[in-house]
Structures are given as C-alpha cells and as structure tokens.
Amino acid sequence: MGKEKFDRSKPHVNVGTIGHVDHGKTTLTAAISAVLAKSQGKAATKFDQIDGAPEERERGITIATAHIEYETDKRHYAHVDCPGHADYVKNMITGAAQMDGAILVVSATDGPMPQTREHILLSRQVGVPFIVVFMNKVDMVDDEELLELVEMEIRELLSEYDFPGDDLPVIQGSALGALNGEAKWEEKIMELMNAVDEYIPEPTRDTEKDFMMPVEDVFSITGRGTVATGRVERGVLKVNDEVEIVGLHEETKKSVCTGVEMFRKLLDYAEAGDNIGALLRGVSRDDIERGQVLAKPNTITPHKTFKAQVYILSKEEGGRHTPFFGNYRPQFYFRTTDVTGMCQLPEGTEMVMPGDNIELTVELIAPIALEKETRFSIREGGRTVGAGSVTEIVE
C-alpha cells in the first residue's frame, strides 16, 4: 500500500487525552479514531495499537506514548495517549509531546480522582493552555442528578487550577458505546470533536514566534568573523537582523547576523527547525559559547533563580537509588549545557524520593536564558536523574 500524502491544507493541532487510570482515555482515543474514520470512509487505529505504546526517549527519560492521527472536516490532529500514569507525568514535564489542548477524561461512575487533579495541576504548571472535558461511562449511571453533580465537581476542580471551569465544554458520553458502533454514543464523539475544533484555538506556529537559537558550537573564519551553529528553536532569522547573545554572563551582548549558512549554502533567512551557522559581526571567538542563545533583542533574559515542576526518576528507570534533601546540588541541563544549581524543597517537604513529582526552587551558579515553560534535565555526572519545566522566574 502506498503512503498517504500528508495534507497540509488543513490546520494542524496537537492534542492528548489526560485523566485518572481506567477512566477510559485509551478507549476514547480509539473511539475518536473509529468514529471519525467511519464518517470519512477510512481505516481507524485500533485499541490494541494504541495500548501497546512504544517507548521513546526524551531528555534521557524513557516514556511510553502512543501517537495517532485523525482529522475532522476542519483540522488535522496529532493525538498522544500514554498507557501509565508515570508516563503522563514524564510526558508533560519533558514536553515530549507538546499539547495545544487536552481532552480530560473523567468517569461518571467515579467522578474526579487523585490523578484527575494531578493531571490538571500539571497542565496548569507546564502550560497546556486549553482543556475540553469528556465525561465517560455515563451509560453506567441512571441518575441524572448524579451526572449533574459529577459535572459540577469537575468544573469546580478545573476552576481551582485557574482553568475557566464554568465556561469550558463538557461532553457526556460513552467511549465504549461509541467504539461498539452505537449511534447515540457515536454522536457524542462527534459532539466532542466539534467542541475540540471550536474551543481549542489554532496554536501560534514556531515560525511566528520571536527568533531564538541555542548555540551548540562556535568557530571563527579568518577574515569573515565568528560563526555560531545550532538548530533554530523558534522564529525566523534574516541576514542583517540584530541579535542578542544571552546567558552564562550577567550582561547580554548585541550583534548583527551578516550571513546564514545551511549545508554549506548561503541563505537569506533561516526558520524554526533549520540547523544553521550564523555569522556574527563584531563578535570575537571568546564572546560567545555553547549554552548561550542567540535571540531577537529584548525577548529573553538571563536568570539564576526559578521555580520548576520536576519529575525525579525512579531507581527502576535508572535514576537515583536514594532520596535527596534540601540543598541538593545536581547539574541542570538547559538546551545545550549543564549548569550546577541548588535545590530548595517546598515548605513541609523533608526529602524527595525517586519517582516523585514535585515543585522545586532552583538557584543556578550562572545565569541562563530562561522563561516560563523552558524544559531541562537534572543530571548527576552526566546521568539523567530527573526532568523539569520552569513554572516561574524568581530573579
């Protein structure tokens, strides 16, 4: 069978299912695929294809995630679903699968459970901007009032974490019913996808954001100047654009990009995803180093102290075998370099166990170009022991 051509005419949006174990996230994922495929006369992704998720490595951490794709009339979706709770935590903290919005699955028979709360908190902390709710298993609840109560409880929980609980869409249905081809439940899946189409806005694409490139390597070309190489993380860099060199030193240097090279060819501009060399005017070989970033002026600043949501690897995952305490000093790996930092634990927390997910305050020994949602790994002697996402800049 020939490969289907990727349709670029429809806007592309990344979503994922979140929620408590056994509330039906994977069944819903399969149901969405089945119902949409049926409506378009295509083949669906089966439940066991999603459940037997392959393992991936992101920032030195192994995460099991299933990626499937489907489309509505308006959009093309990439959907991520994780088999285990720890996989969700790791996925969200490492940003392995960035979500433009999430579908929160809550069983009508249980209502919100501990992981429901944890996934909502994580969504808030790591910047999942929009949540649509699917109340699952409503075919197992006869009491209309009970359904109303559960919906109220979900909305209140979302509001507690600063999501617009009163206004966001809540669809009541049965994922299993839809998967089994029952028309009334299939209808609810279409209603859910309609809500996702309408409520989750199209994301700002990486090329539309402000230019930023982590510096991987630096070398000088006699008679031409200094070249910084790296992969453009976001935005566009045009020849003759002004740039700033940010991080590792208190003061930020300015320069002008006088040339952009890719695969030994000269370009007029580079955009997000390109691996390039940027020729910088008036910059000596010692003014710039790996670990800094090139950025559009006044868009990112160097910081030493921040709060972060982190996941600490369990012993089984190759992490630490013992807990750590306050004043723990590992290395924090940001983009292309390690910087030592000191950890402060939240008030009332004595120690952090391998396998924990917690908010830490970190003070680095050198400033790094940071902003909310910057991802990093935590390492000890080159071995990854955790991962995190910046939730707040302190100074």
Swiss-Prot record:
EC number(s) reported in the record: 3.6.5.3
GO molecular function, one term: GTP binding
Start and end residues of each stretch annotated as G1: 19-26
Coiled coil: none
Catalytic activity: GTP + H2O = GDP + phosphate + H(+)
Domain of life: Bacteria
Enzyme class (EC, first level): hydrolase
Places the protein is found: Cytoplasm
Membrane found in the keyword field: no
Function: GTP hydrolase that promotes the GTP-dependent binding of aminoacyl-tRNA to the A-site of ribosomes during protein biosynthesis.
Name listed for the protein in its UniProt record: Elongation factor Tu
Source organism: Exiguobacterium sibiricum (strain DSM 17290 / CCUG 55495 / CIP 109462 / JCM 13490 / 255-15)
Lineage: Bacteria, Bacillati, Bacillota, Bacilli, Bacillales
Gene field: tuf
